Regions:
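Hydrophobic ligand-binding cavity/cleft-lining segments
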Residues: 1-38
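Short, surface-exposed charged micro-motifs
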Residues: 8, 43, 70, 98-100
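A generic beta-sheet turn/junction motif
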Residues: 11, 75, 103-105
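Hydrophobic pocket/interface hotspot
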Residues: 18, 28, 52, 71, ...
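Glycine-rich portal/gate segments that line the openings of hydrophobic small-molecule binding cavities
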Residues: 40-83
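Short, highly charged C-terminal tails/helix-capping segments
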Residues: 140-147
């Protein structure tokens, strides 16, 4: 049975910055690929009904996998919902991802739900990948660059 992954983080950044990091192609390749992977955005049309395609490449092995989907809901600085599907036929099914951004006293509370993760991907591996990605997201949006 497909897995559902739920993650929660509080980031020291505004909802505007965190939301933008999920929709900006340059930001996505900086933070979304987990440790050991590089990323490439092939296209990103971030509007409801628009689509995206991205790939991760294992840096040491050179193997890559592509995935993409469609934006279902975009509420600026509050919520993103999209579908996500791997191109590899061995990773079947469409996933549904919901990200909720909530302004809190010290930044942004981010909740992520990823439903329908294919059975062949261990849930713990998915959690690990997301955790690594969220550390990179924090480094991007929490940076205090004065120039």
């Amino acid at each position: 049975m497909p897995s559902t992954i739920r993650l929660h983080r509080v980031l020291r950044a505004t909802p505007e910055w965190v939301y933008r990091a999920f929709l900006d192609p340059d930001a996505m390749v900086k933070w979304l690929p987990p440790n050991g992977f590089t990323g490439k955005v092939h296209h990103m049309d971030a509007h409801v009904g628009g689509s995206y395609k991205m790939s991760f490449k294992n840096f040491t092995m050179g193997k890559s996998h592509a995935f993409g989907g469609e934006y279902v809901e975009l509420v600026p600085h509050e919520r993103i919902r999209y579908t996500d599907k791997f191109e590899d036929p061995n990773l079947p099914g469409a996933m549904k991802v919901t990200i909720i951004f909530k302004k809190v006293s010290c930044g942004t509370d981010v909740s992520i739900t990823q439903e329908g993760v294919p059975d062949v991907i261990p849930a713990e591996a998915c959690y690990l990948g997301w955790q690594e990605s969220l550390i990179l997201l924090a480094k991007l949006v929490e940076a205090e660059i004065l120039v």
